C-alpha cells in the first residue's frame, strides 16, 4: 500500500469541505482528521494547499470551515482572512457552489502551495 502525499490528502479534504460548505457546516480539526484517517494535530499542513489554491484563484477561503474545538476559530495557520472577517467569509464559502467548481487535482493543489505558501502568512 502506498502512502498518500500531502497534496493527495488535501484533495481528500477538499471533498469533505465542499460537502460541509453545501450543508452550511463548520468542522473541527478532530472531525476532519477522523474523516480522512489522520491525526488532527498537524492537519494544518494538509490544509495549506487548499488555502493557497483558494487565494491564488480568487475563491472564498474554504479552509475557514475547519476550526479549533476549544475556540470555534480557525487555527494559527489560517491566513485567508482576519478575525473581523470570519463571519462574512464563512457566508461567502457557504454561498459558493463548490460542486460546480469541482475539486482541483492534487497536482494543482501542490502547485498552489509551492507558488503561494500561505500557512501563517498574510492573505494580502
Where in this protein do the model-derived segments appear?
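Nucleic acid-binding interface residues in structured DNA/RNA-binding domains
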Residues: 2-12, 18-21, 25-124
Amino acid at each position: 500500500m502506498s502512502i498518500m502525499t500531502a497534496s493527495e490528502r488535501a484533495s481528500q479534504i477538499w471533498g469533505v469541505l465542499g460537502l460541509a460548505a453545501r450543508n452550511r457546516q463548520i468542522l473541527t480539526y478532530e472531525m476532519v482528521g477522523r474523516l480522512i484517517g489522520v491525526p488532527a494535530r498537524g492537519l494544518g499542513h494538509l490544509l495549506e494547499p487548499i488555502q493557497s489554491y483558494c487565494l491564488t484563484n480568487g475563491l472564498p477561503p474554504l479552509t475557514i470551515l475547519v476550526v479549533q474545538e476549544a475556540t470555534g476559530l480557525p487555527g494559527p495557520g489560517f491566513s485567508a482572512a482576519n478575525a473581523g472577517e470570519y463571519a462574512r467569509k464563512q457566508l461567502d464559502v457557504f454561498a459558493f457552489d463548490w460542486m460546480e467548481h469541482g475539486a482541483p487535482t492534487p497536482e494543482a493543489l501542490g502547485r498552489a502551495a509551492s507558488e503561494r505558501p500561505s500557512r501563517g502568512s498574510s492573505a494580502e
